[in-house]
Amino acid sequence: MDASTLFKKVKVKRVLGSLEQQIDDITTDSRTAREGSIFVASVGYTVDSHKFCQSVADQGCKLVVVNKEQSLSANVTQVVVPDTLRVASILAHTLFDYPSHQLVTFGVTGTNGKTSIATMIHLIQRKLQKNSAYLGTNGFQINETKTKGANTTPETVSLTKKIKEAVDAGAESMTLEVSSHGLVLGRLRGVEFDVAIFSNLTQDHLDFHGTMEAYGHAKSLLFSQLGEDLSKEKYVVLNNDDSFSEYLRTVTPYEVFSYGIDEEAQFMAENIQESLQGVSFDFVTPFGTYQVKSPYVGKFNISNIMAAMIAVWSKGTSLETIIKAVENLEPVEGRLEVLDPSLPIDLIIDYAHTADGMNKLIDAVQPFVKQKLIFLVGMAGERDLTKTPEMGRVACRADYVIFTPDNPANDDPKMLTAELAKGATHQNYIEFDDRAEGIKHAIDIAEPGDTVVLASKGREPYQIMPGHIKVPHRDDLIGLEAAYKKFGGGPVGQ
């Protein structure tokens, strides 16, 4: 596309150079800039990428978007705008022909449950023989092909490229986990959502948002930014068991479908049966009651299942068809995942990293604990420490507790575990400043019949260490290796 055509959509302050050049790519990553691409510089939290403008020029890039004039070679065109990342979003969607308009787009937000609901929607679509894509905490996936991702919600240009990739691969729908950070930072500008889903709102990320009010407002942006065009078939799916849903109803003009277990809703779960092999329940709907069976464990996953089913149903698939698909869904990686059922202990990993998430996790497993419940939890570095003692208190619902760091970054691991220990309600706990050693200890003290829960990381494949260096780490592999060494079995797979 000709750059002059591309920039007709943008109000610019000044153009230094010529826009008469062909553009086939846009990037905010200086390492990928080249001839034919636009490099968009921005001022980030730790890096101002304007300093890389000459480097991208040396790589052949002839057009940069900046917030103030740079000292560059004369053959490099500079487009000066007030908000470079907002412009990046407009340019990306224009250049790639508004890819989110070309498929059904589901957006899932909430403190807990985003990954599970989004993955369930994707897996249901696949069981229905529909081409589907997923983007979120567990990476990027088109049908069964997976790639890793850095953030739950990538920056705006990368996000647009992922949607374009899904469209080019023939995806009929795409499900995105929508983080509060991504909403506030404008990473989702220009994405046309067809269905917006809310799971819950509990304390988290106050290091970024400051207050629960600001955090809630951030989540609400997904719904308020659906637009006002009532000729479009857009829908909202809300959890009536969370009171924040009442507010979300007021910020969107589109039809709302509610679900709940404890509070009255249009879609409800009754006669719930739970085991470590899954759940079953009566799905009470405006159209009748259906029996639902699922391999997912825990009452909270019933809420997630209902949200996913309603979202897919809202776009035209019958409930009967969806319910059949749900019976045979694969596990959501790292979410109440039972590792190797042949072991004499129940070894479980989960991503729960808030007090609310931990409470729900313990509620789910406690009825099936045959002997002791051993619970390991970590606290992340450079995060909101006001939630930490409450996490320690909840962890002490278990018989024995292990406190570790989780992505300590530049914080002292001993300080993080001490903050968790402040909430301890009994003395049956131990602190480890090395998470891997904490996991090995959990297995070492476990006896046949015990349940060992490794919480807060799921299958996250790294630890963030000082200098924000990512060091390879897998709770599941460390736990399994220790369990096989003690009890026999294996080998550990990748």
Swiss-Prot record:
Enzyme class, spelled out: ligase
Catalytic activity line of the entry: UDP-N-acetyl-alpha-D-muramoyl-L-alanyl-D-glutamate + L-lysine + ATP = UDP-N-acetyl-alpha-D-muramoyl-L-alanyl-gamma-D-glutamyl-L-lysine + ADP + phosphate + H(+)
One BP annotation, GO: peptidoglycan biosynthetic process
Post-translational modification: Carboxylation is probably crucial for Mg(2+) binding and, consequently, for the gamma-phosphate positioning of ATP.
Binding site for UDP-N-acetyl-alpha-D-muramoyl-L-alanyl-D-glutamate: 30, 152-153, 179, 187
Binding positions (ATP): 110-116
Record's keyword terms, sorted: ATP-binding, Cell cycle, Cell division, Cell shape, Cell wall biogenesis/degradation, Cytoplasm, Ligase, Nucleotide-binding, Peptidoglycan synthesis
Position of sequence motif L-lysine recognition motif: 406-409
A Pfam family it matches: Mur_ligase_M
GO CC term (a single one): cytoplasm
Residues the record lists as N6-carboxylysine modifications: 219
Record carries keyword Nucleotide-binding: yes
Cited InterPro entries: Mur-like_cat_sf, Mur_ligase_C, Mur_ligase_C_dom_sf, Mur_ligase_cen, MurE/MurF_N, UDP-N-AcMur-Glu-dNH2Pim_ligase
Compartments (UniProt record): Cytoplasm
The protein's annotated pathway: Cell wall biogenesis; peptidoglycan biosynthesis
Enzyme nomenclature, EC number: 6.3.2.7
Main location: cytoplasm
GO MF terms, alphabetically ordered: ATP binding; magnesium ion binding; UDP-N-acetylmuramoyl-L-alanyl-D-glutamate-L-lysine ligase activity
Family under the similarity heading: Belongs to the MurCDEF family. MurE subfamily.
Known role: Catalyzes the addition of L-lysine to the nucleotide precursor UDP-N-acetylmuramoyl-L-alanyl-D-glutamate (UMAG) in the biosynthesis of bacterial cell-wall peptidoglycan.
Protein name as annotated: UDP-N-acetylmuramoyl-L-alanyl-D-glutamate--L-lysine ligase
Organism from which the protein derives: Staphylococcus aureus (strain MRSA252)
